[in-house]
Amino acid sequence: MGESIMKKAKEDAPSVDDSKKLAIEQAMSQIEKQFGKGSIMKLGSDSAKQTVQVIPSGSLDLDIALGIGGYPIGRIVEIYGPESSGKTTLTLSAIAEAQKRGGVAAFIDAEHALDPSYAKKLGVNIDELLVSQPDNGEEALEICESLVRSNAIDLIVIDSVAALVPKAEIEGDMGDSHMGLQARLMSQALRKLTGTIAKSKTVVIFINQIRMKIGVMFGSPETTTGGNALKFYCSVRLDIRKIETIKEKEESVGNRVRVKVVKNKCAPPFKQAEFDIIFNAGISREGSLVDLGVKHDIIHKAGAWYSYNTEKIGQGKEAAKEYLKNNPEIALTIENMVRDLNSLPLLVQENNKKSRKEEKLEQAAG
């Protein structure tokens, strides 16, 4: 009798694997409750992706790599890389996307290097863009906090962390030592900003530069400016690098860049995106569609020829890009097929027509 009861109890008891799974789920639930959603997830799981609202990055490749379709609203994002790698282009593209959706954007230009004509070429409505050129780091971060607290701004870009020079350093003499001042300033500002950003549903993008650590024997000698606080407070960190120069008849017309998602608290990290940035035009949408179309077997490549639905669309990538530029309906269909395969929201035809109409009006005005 006693033996049969014990046998039945053993059969009813969950297996070791099941009990472990249950314990892990409870631990993950407790961690998320304590530290917030996205603090822990299974690396390869689609369920790890949160249903967060986003502002598209302006690059379909990058939206896919981010896993959620853009920059998460109410979070801090850091974009860093070497000079002339496309950091400002990436942020201006995001500003254009935010404005297209009726949002308000601000650009805190601590480097005093924003080119309005270039911003306009990337689709930024410069008449509606709020711009500030602060004198010191404290002023820049206070302006950022005031804008966030207004609850009316969708996207704020700070260019760049390296240019956020503390007031004491500006007012001091050239040879004075100001060790750790900027790191302290960033740490204090981010402690105040993080909670406010989440409540106001603003995306704050910090552009950062790369520096070399002296005396590093093992590992990467590269580091970003402004101390460690920004690394911790960011939900997304992007490392952008130029990988090759795009040439047309021996003339440089753009750069191909690779963006690594170094940190992502909204979806599994470590994904990469490669796309073209054309000089004076920005991120090449058609170039991305050709690359992604081939990758997802929507566009077929045989030798140098590209074809879509058995119809040849061009010999060489440039010809295929030109075909998609001249046939926006087909380009939209291909983009929506790519979006559908990557679980991103689809675009509607009306939006596409509206944006083309706006482009014509801008050309007429120019």
Swiss-Prot record:
GO biological process: DNA recombination; DNA repair; SOS response
Annotated GO CC locations: cytoplasm
Positions that bind ATP: G81, P82, E83, S84, S85, G86, K87, T88
Keywords from the UniProt entry: ATP-binding, Cytoplasm, DNA damage, DNA recombination, DNA repair, DNA-binding, Nucleotide-binding, SOS response
Xref: PROSITE patterns: RECA_2, RECA_3
Entry keyword annotation includes ATP-binding: yes
SMART domains for this protein: AAA
Keyword Transit peptide found: no
Localization terms from the record: Cytoplasm
Classification via Pfam families: RecA, RecA_C
InterPro entries: AAA+_ATPase, DNA_recomb/repair_RecA, P-loop_NTPase, RecA-like_C, RecA-like_N, RecA_ATP-bd, RecA_C_sf, RecA_monomer-monomer_interface
Gene3D superfamilies the UniProt entry points to: P-loop containing nucleotide triphosphate hydrolases (3.40.50.300)
GO molecular function terms attached to this record: ATP binding; ATP hydrolysis activity; ATP-dependent DNA damage sensor activity; damaged DNA binding; single-stranded DNA binding
Task of the protein: Can catalyze the hydrolysis of ATP in the presence of single-stranded DNA, the ATP-dependent uptake of single-stranded DNA by duplex DNA, and the ATP-dependent hybridization of homologous single-stranded DNAs. It interacts with LexA causing its activation and leading to its autocatalytic cleavage.
Family from the record: Belongs to the RecA family.
NCBIfam families: tigrfam_recA
Name of the protein in question: Protein RecA
Protein species of origin: Leptospira interrogans serogroup Icterohaemorrhagiae serovar Lai (strain 56601)
